[in-house]
Amino acid sequence: AVAREGFGMDVHIFDPYLAPDKVPSGMTLHPSLESLLGLADYISVSVPLTASTRGLIGAAQFACCKKTAVLINSARGGVVDEAALYAALAEGRLFGAACDVFEQEPPTAENPLFSLPRFIGSLHIGANTEEALIRVGRTVASDVLAVLNGREPRFPYGQ
């Protein structure tokens, strides 16, 4: 929503578990990941690493992307197949990519992605700021108090 309002973007999403009536206002839900990838200028990956999401974005998915698309992976290492990402970038099938998560963390200087001019890599440290740690502590404490007082927590485990 922030991107849509701040940058004038159309926001399209794919979520196999999201009911159509629960789609946030102003967003378009796609029936498949591939249909979304074929339209996207910027692809932001935001999923946990599970058995079903490991390698979620691989060679077949990159084949669906526009050659002008940019991939942003700040989810978890292993969700994007790095060998397939390297091939897509090196062969010009994807314009660019930025990742702050890698299959091997921390990434080594020998990671071939770092040799590509249209790849930006950084460490996944966004949650390690003092402000983020304080916010997490407050959120956990608030949810514990909610449960102790017979209310639903704001962030129940597993949801």
Positions of predicted regions on the chain:
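Rossmann-like dinucleotide/phosphate-binding beta-alpha-beta segment
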Residues: 1-67
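Rossmann-like dinucleotide-binding domain for NAD(H)/NADP(H)
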Residues: 68-159
